[in-house]
Structure formats: C-alpha cells, structure tokens
C-alpha cells in the first residue's frame, strides 16, 4: 500500500497528514518502549518484590522476543499492510503492559514480555518502510531526522512521567496505565496514516507569484 513513484522533498512531506500520523504513532509506541527500557527492573523489584537478579533476567527476555518479532515483521511487511501491522503492534504494547500492571501473577509478566517484545520487533521495521514507501528515498534522511525530533519527545516523556507518578503515588500503576492507554490510542494514528498525495512546493508558490505578476 502507498508505494510512491515520486520522491517527496522534506518540505513536501511535512505538509502531508501522513508524515504527522506516522510520527505521532511512532512516538506513542515509544511511551511504553522507553519506559520499559528504563523502569521495568525497578517496577519488578519495587512493585512486585522480585530480586534484582530475577528482575534483570525477566527484562532480558524482552530483546529475545524483539529479535523474533523483527525477523517476522520484516517478512510480514512485504506481504501485508504495514499500517495494519503497526496498529496491531500498538495494541499489543499497551494491552500487555495493562495486563502485567493489573493482574499480579507470573503469567501476566510472561504475557507482557512476549507481547511487548514481539510488538516492538513487528512494529520497528514498518516505521522506516512506511516512510520510504510514502515519501521515496531522495529526502529520506532529512524526513527521518525530522521525525526523530518528534519521536524523541515521546521517548523522553514516557519514563519521566511514569517515574514522577510513581514518586507521587508510591507505585507504577497509574503511570503505566496512562502510558498504556496512550500507546493503545496511538493505534488511531496508523489508521489515518494513509498514503499521501504529493503537492509540489512549486505548485503552492505558484498562486502567490501569479498574484504579484497581475499587479
């Protein structure tokens, strides 16, 4: 879906809804991803009572499932709708974290590790591939770089918000709940990240030039 023959410039890409929907969806995913990277061992030791060694072992399984998801996601992205894959991954990120936070069992920890790791891996390849499909390759670097500025805001906000709320409430439940719901809501961004229509910058500047010439 949405493979473009035309190559967008950075300014043309930024004027499309697709650029913003992908960037916001990608950022919403990192609310959970960045928080888990920094806070999962702390959550497991402080809220769930695990030893530091066991918490580190559990956290270490996340990259394993991410690897499996990445391998699978690269294949599926060539066969199926990339937006659909990314959207499903968003639901997996959020629902897995909610399950772990609200159901205090070993099983839900395992469910989270599997769902989150697979979702991270499945979604990751689609982020660059969607941008390449939609905007072409000639300005891919600047487009990706500008997207990264937006994504980084989410990546920083996630762990800071979760940590702040944990200090205020005494546990990570509220913070992780908010981040989970934010990531699940990010599913909507990928629903609306439909292929863009290219409007050349020259076409936008043309009316202004025409008005000046007519004076």
Question: Where are the language model's segments positioned?
Answer:
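Helix-to-loop junctions at the C-terminal end of transmembrane segments
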Residues: 70-81, 166-167
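Extracytoplasmic gate region of multi-pass secondary transporters
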Residues: 11-75, 158
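Multi-pass alpha-helical transporter architecture, strongest
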Residues: 180-215
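Intracellular juxtamembrane helix-capping segments at the cytosolic ends
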Residues: 122-135
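Structural signature of the two symmetry-related core transmembrane helices
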Residues: 84-99
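A membrane-interface helix-boundary motif in multi-pass transporters
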Residues: 164-181
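Paired small-residue
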Residues: 107-115
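A late C-terminal transmembrane helix in Major Facilitator Superfamily
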Residues: 134-169
């Amino acid at each position: 879906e949405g493979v473009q023959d035309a190559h967008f410039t950075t300014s043309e890409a930024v004027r499309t809804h697709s650029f913003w929907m992908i960037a916001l969806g990608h950022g919403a995913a990192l609310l959970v991803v960045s928080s888990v990277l920094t806070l999962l061992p702390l959550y497991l030791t402080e809220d769930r009572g695990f030893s530091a060694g066991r918490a580190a072992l559990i956290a270490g399984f996340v990259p394993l499932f991410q690897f499996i998801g990445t391998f699978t996601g690269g294949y599926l992205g060539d066969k199926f709708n990339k937006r659909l894959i990314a959207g499903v991954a968003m639901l997996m990120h959020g629902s897995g974290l909610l399950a772990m936070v609200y159901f205090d069992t070993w099983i839900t920890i395992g469910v989270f590790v599997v769902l989150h790791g697979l979702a991270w891996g499945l979604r990751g390849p689609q982020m660059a591939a969607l941008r390449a499909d939609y905007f072409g390759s000639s300005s891919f670097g600047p487009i990706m770089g500008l997207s990264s500025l937006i994504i980084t805001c989410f990546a920083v906000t996630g762990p800071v918000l979760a940590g702040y709320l944990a200090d205020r409430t005494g546990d990570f439940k509220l913070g992780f709940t908010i981040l989970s719901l934010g990531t699940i809501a990010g599913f909507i961004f990928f629903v609306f990240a439909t292929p863009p229509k290219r409007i050349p910058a020259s076409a936008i500047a043309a009316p202004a030039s025409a008005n000046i010439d007519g004076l």
